[in-house]
Amino acid sequence: WQNRRFFWNAKTKRPWVVLKWAESRDGYMDGRPLQERQPGAGGFPITAETARPLTHTWRALEQGIVVGANTALVDTPELNVRSIEAPSPRIVLLDPDGLINMEHALIQRNDNLIYVVGPTKGSVTKHSCQWEVKEGLDALLERLYAEFNLSSLLVEGGATVLNDFLKQDAWNEIKCWRSPAATGGGLPAPTIPDHSLPLPHGLASSGQLGVDAWTNRLHSRHASD
């Protein structure tokens, strides 16, 4: 189990993919209506501050952290490790439709950011990766592994990106926070698939930190790991 990333890399030539999100008690990732989720609006906290150290520990475990263009525009996230002493993973920004301006803070502040763009944009940053949505996520994962040697990824959003990974079955592990508070509406969170399993070898698959609960699930393809 401890070497799961290495064995998966050797077998598939793709990174180990961990999907991560936080949801309210009634199943929303963001409690704001669509008209309020506009570029520059900022993030919408779901969990309490007490959840942050574990979230940053999860980030530090992986080599890359994936975010979609819409989330980058609306939330303007930092996507680094701040609450613990550990290196931050490389940011992988998915923007195949060219929505992001080169002056965006994520690009300006992260010299080693991997910018995933459509083939018509060419190499727009020092670390560009060309990819089209129609190629599928497996093609992107193979490219990120071959070109940037990323052995593992933490996919943090947004909802569209997370659901794409789920629909294409391009994931290995899920880590989900659940808040005791309800938002009463907003942006629906993804649904953990029925074919997910508890972690093996008696490892904790759920827990509580402060008021928030967390769940860690494994894809059923790893049932014998």
List where the protein language model places each region:
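A gly/proline- and charged-residue-enriched helix-loop-helix capping module
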Residues: 2-3
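Enzymes that bind and transform nitrogen-containing heteroaromatic metabolites
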Residues: 7-225
